Every structure is written in structure tokens, then in C-alpha cells.
Amino acid sequence: EEVVGKQKVNWKALYEKSLNHDYTERFIGDIKTPVKYATPQLRKMIGEVEEKMTQKFIKEEIPKEFQAIYTKRLSEAKDDTLEGKILSICDKLDLLYEAYGEIELGNPNPVFMQMFKESLETIKKYDDMVCVQYFIKHILPDLFKGDFAGKDKMQRIAFSILLMGDADK
């Protein structure tokens, strides 16, 4: 364990959660983000399929005496523990950077601006955490230093979310 801010991080738990949280992609493949984010209904359906396939895998492939352990390890790792919250933030940072990269390269697909917005909204929900405060204060501003198509819109979205709590204003 390590103290970060005023909280103790259990690095072993965080490592296990990080290692296993995308395990379900083994069953359905890594569906490209724009496809996953095409509609909320599709995202929900993909999650349901992943969950059912994971349960089936555990039931059919894992010896009975280890099924409870694997059910826990392969379940949703983004829980209310400190480590689950850190994983949620990291996952959204990954998505935010994916969207940023596509926008910076000039990809006109509006799904990337939506991904950027939704990622930042989720990250903002954890703004009581030291790592998020650091990201907002020191890292996020660097994203807007260069010139690229979509920069002004991204800045407006970030400003609205971080200062007003609503990107639609």
C-alpha cells in the first residue's frame, strides 16, 4: 500500500483490476470505440453480451472450486473502492486521449467530440481525488496548446464541464 494524498492505494488490487477489466474483449474482440459509442443502446447491449459470455466461460471452463474467485476477478472492476475509482478514471483518460487524437488529426466524425465530452464528464465526477485535480490543473491545459481543427469546440466543452458542470450550455 502507498499513501497518495490522504488515501492508501492498494497497488496489488489496482493491478488485478487493471489486468482483468477488459478480459471480456477476449470473447467478442476489441470493438472499435466509434462503433461502441454509436448509440447508448448498443453500448448497453455489448455490455450485456460481454457479461453473459463471461458467465458462460466461467461455468464451462473453470473448475467449480475456482468459479467464485474468477467470477469476482472478471466482474466489473470499476467499483466504489479507491482502486476501482482510479481504474474508472484511467479508462476514461484513455478514451479521452483516443478522442483527442482523432479530433487533432481532423477526423470529422462527431462521435469523437461526444466521446471527449462524456469522458471529461465522467472524470469530473471524481474531482475530489488528487489525481483528477492534478490532471485538470496540469495536464488538460496542455491538450489545447497546439492549433488543430476542433480545438475551440473542445475548449468550450472542457470549460463548460469543469466550470459550469454542463457541456450543453
Region locations from a protein language model:
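Alpha-helical, largely C-terminal catalytic domains
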Residues: 1-169
